[in-house]
Structure formats: C-alpha cells, structure tokens
Amino acid sequence: MAAGSASSLGGGSWPGSEAGDFLARYRQVSNKLKKRFLRKPNVAEAGEQFAQLARELRAQECLPYAAWCQLAVARCQQALFHGPGEALALTEAARLFLRQECDARQRLGCPAAYGEPLQAAASALGAAVRLHLELGQPAAAAALCLELAAALRAVGQPAAAAGHFQRAAQLHLPLMPLAALQALGDAASCQLLARDYTGALAVFTRMQRLAREHGGHPVQQPELPQQLPSVPQPSLPGPQPRPVLGSTLPLPLPPDHAPGSVAQSPGTLGAFADVLVRCEVSRVLLLLLLQPPPAKLLPEHAQTLEKYSWEAFDGHGQDSSGQLPEELFLLLQSLVMAAHEKDTEGIKKLQVEMWPLLTAEQNHLLHLVLQETISPSGQGV
C-alpha cells in the first residue's frame, strides 16, 4: 500500500526502470518485517535499510519516495519503542513533503498532487509533536509547530498557520514567555492576512495581557554581606600605621537600594514594552475598523477606547498606564475622535502624520479604517 501511494505521489518524476528498482527494493525490505514461524523479524536492520534507501532517493531528488521511506523508518522505530528516533524520522519525512510542495509551486505554480504532500507533512509533524510532548520536550514540540506554521504561511494558507502559531505559543509560555508572545504576534499577522479581524483582535488582547503579566515583575536586589565584628589585633613593637578615616564606615545606600529591598519597575521591561505598544496600536485600529455595537463591545475593549477620549486626557499627553510615546498617543486620540465623528478629511490628514510611526501592518489597518469610513459596510472591510 505504501509503495502504491508512493507511486501515486511520484507524479512521473522517475523513469520507469528506476521506479521499478525502488519498488523492488522497498518490497524486499518490507518482506523482512513479516512474521514467520519460529523467526523474529530484524526490525533494526530493516530500519537501517529504509534509511539508506531514503538517503539515496533524496540525493536523486526523488522527494516523495524518500519521504515514504522515512515514514517506514518511523514505523520501525515505533516497533523498537524508540521515541526519539521515531520523532526524528517523522520530522524528516514531513520536511521532504514540504520541500516537494514548495518545489511544485515554484516550478508549476500550483499545489503538488492536489495538496496531498502538504497534508502528509502536517500529519507527520503533528505525530512528531505528540511524541516530543510525551518525551517531556515542549520546546522541541513548539519548534516543530513554528516550522509547520511558517511553511503553511509561505504556501498561502495563513488561516491554517495561525492555529499552529498559537499552539507553539501555548507550549512556549511556561518557560519562554517572550517567544510565546512572538508566536502570538505571528498568529495575529496570519489572521490579518486571512481577513479574520475579530480573531486578530482577540489575539492582540491576549498578547497585551500576557505582556503585562510577564514583563512587569520587580527585580530583587541582592543581599549585601553583613560586616563581621572587628577582632583586636595584637600590638607589635615599633611605629604603627595610622588608620585611614572612613575606611571602615559603610557607604550610605539610596532608599530604593536597601539590602533585600524590591526595586519598583517603572513599567514593562525590555522587549515586553515593544509588544505592549504594538498590541495597543493594533487593537485601537481594529476596534475602529470593526466598530462593534455597544451591546457586543467587551469590557476590555471599551476601556481601551475610553483611554483615548477627551474626558480621560490627564494633561500630560499620555494615560497613566500606557507605554505609548506622547506623539503617537495624541495622534491615536485624534484618530479615535475623527472616526467617531466620521471625519474623513481628518482621518486622511492623520494618516499622513501617523504613517512614519506605524508598522506596515498597522498602516494597512489604518488604510482599511479610512476605506471603511468612506464606504461603510456594516461589518468591517
């Protein structure tokens, strides 16, 4: 069955004599795995021969055949109860299927074999992810999820890629929150490419909450060593050196650097602050684009829009809890008011001023907000 499937996936990329030679060798190795009376099959030897055949086929650019041989290697490793070997073989098979799909799209401009290699790659990588999780390797599982998501995004399937990015973020979150936030950002970008603006808004909201939780922890100051009591030294005959004044006095510490004190963080630390800025701007633009009715406006979204109303303006050009630069905050505040008043000309002028301050993704959202203001659709663009 596997040989027949491999023949169907080959698509005539192999001359007839060489294809027959491959099938003969594949069947010859497969026959060694059949159970016989009073004879135990040598699974390890068969796995090595399948791996050797896969290397030869890969060198000859026969990618689907090599991938099916790697799947046979994975079955042999499973029979030997060798989880790492099985996961490695499944990963190699998936990469070969993905390479076949990319080559077909580059050469022919269409999916290979009606998208079957892409489905086979997703299935193999999914099995490898489950194995890594069973082995207690969430980082390796997350890396495979990111690899599959990037491949799906590259072949023009951003909606499917977003789910794998979110799964990678879930696996990264306990140990590497910054990597999890980056994966969530990629998921939100994929949802924007797929025009799932409601889903992107939910992801940005979650990103902002996680960035505040993991990026605003105070830093514990190290304990200073306590001074030991001075022991009187026996006096020696002869002149003694004069002690230096102040050499034994402890240096005064600032109030916020006392031993064992907790330094209060002025805000979100490091790269988490950049994540907060991106999420805040993107959420405001998405809310202006979607324009949800008050009955369907979630409390966290209502609080976001309230921060940019004139009533919430504190006179310093920034809200008390925000991380935005003052200029960007004032421009966003003006944009919210202009969108509320349906001021098309005002939005156009603000677009010119905000263009250098936003990313390409955010500038596209701002353009959609302008188009929605000019031609309202009732459900966003």
Swiss-Prot record:
Question: InterPro entries given for it?
Answer: F8A (IPR039494), TPR-like_helical_dom_sf (IPR011990)
Superkingdom is: Eukaryota
Question: Which residues does this entry mark as bearing N-acetylalanine?
Answer: 2
Where is this chain's protein located in or outside the cell? Cytoplasm; Nucleus; Early endosome; Nucleus, Nuclear body
Q: What is the documented function of this protein?
A: RAB5A effector molecule that is involved in vesicular trafficking of early endosomes. Mediates the recruitment of HTT by RAB5A onto early endosomes. The HTT-F8A1/F8A2/F8A3-RAB5A complex stimulates early endosomal interaction with actin filaments and inhibits interaction with microtubules, leading to the reduction of endosome motility.
Whether Nucleus counts among this entry's keywords is yes
Residues of the region (Disordered) are: 213-260
Q: What protein name does the entry list?
A: 40-kDa huntingtin-associated protein
